[in-house]
Structures are given as structure tokens and as C-alpha cells.
Amino acid sequence: MRIMGLDVGSKTVGVAISDPLGWTAQGVETIQIDESRKQFGYDRVKELVLEYEVEKVVVGLPKNMNNTIGPRAESSKIYAEVLESRIGLPVVLWDERLTTSAAERTLIEADVSRKKRKEVIDKLAAVMILQSYLDTTN
């Protein structure tokens, strides 16, 4: 069963997909979105769900360090609810605290240029969210 992981931001959605056995996560793409124009990338996510035969979606929930829900986490919750109604599959929220920071550190340690980091950071964060989910549930 393939599972999709999403790192939802205000400008992009990082996408990762699990292998068919649900053991490892691989980055797929970064979808450009524009919240101010109500362009959220739902159609592209649905295309990827169909292409990869996804059966479940995991959306990162960026809780605050004190475990509270801030504005970004509220946006992620709404995104997950709308996505679930549009694709007709279960959508799970997953604590993603510090995944973007960890992804940034990983890319810096790998000596990836600032320009390239900007291109792949959300996809890598989606991989980290999904891999955390897979490691915990398998």
C-alpha cells in the first residue's frame, strides 16, 4: 500500500511517496501554490494519488514546541480536511515539528547551494514527515 506524505506551506507543498511495501519514503515533487489566490494544488495532488495508486495521505502538522496549534498548523488542518473530501481517501495529520529545520541542516551538511536548497527543502521535509510516519506505524 502506497502512502503519500505532504509538507504544506504557504507557497509550496512538498510531496513524498512510500514504496509499495510502505517501508521507505521518496521525494516526488514540490507543488507551487498561492494561498492569496486560493490556489492550493489539490488537483495536482489528486493526479499524483491516482498515478501512484496511493491509499492514504499523511499531512504534516507543524505544532508549536509547547504542543499548541498555531496559525500554520490550523492551515494544515484545513488543507487536510479539504483534501480528504476531494480525493475520498483517509488523510492523517502527523506531528512535523522541526522537520523543515532538520531538512535544512541535512542539505547544509551535504554542501547543497542555497538556491538548490530552496528548490528541494519542502520535498525533503515531506520525505521526513512520511518516513517518521512509516517508522512509527510499521
Curated annotation (Swiss-Prot):
CDD domains from the UniProt entry: YqgF
EC number: 3.1.-.-
GO terms for MF: nuclease activity
InterPro entries: RNaseH-like_sf, YqgF, YqgF/RNaseH-like_dom, YqgF/RNaseH-like_dom_sf
An individual GO BP term: rRNA 5'-end processing
Sorted UniProt keywords: Cytoplasm, Hydrolase, Nuclease, Ribosome biogenesis
A matching Pfam family: RuvX
Reported function: Could be a nuclease involved in processing of the 5'-end of pre-16S rRNA.
Family from the record: Belongs to the YqgF nuclease family.
HAMAP family: Nuclease_YqgF (MF_00651)
PANTHER family, A to Z: POLYNUCLEOTIDYL TRANSFERASE, RIBONUCLEASE H-LIKE SUPERFAMILY PROTEIN
Listed name of the protein: Putative pre-16S rRNA nuclease
Annotated organism of origin: Listeria innocua serovar 6a (strain ATCC BAA-680 / CLIP 11262)
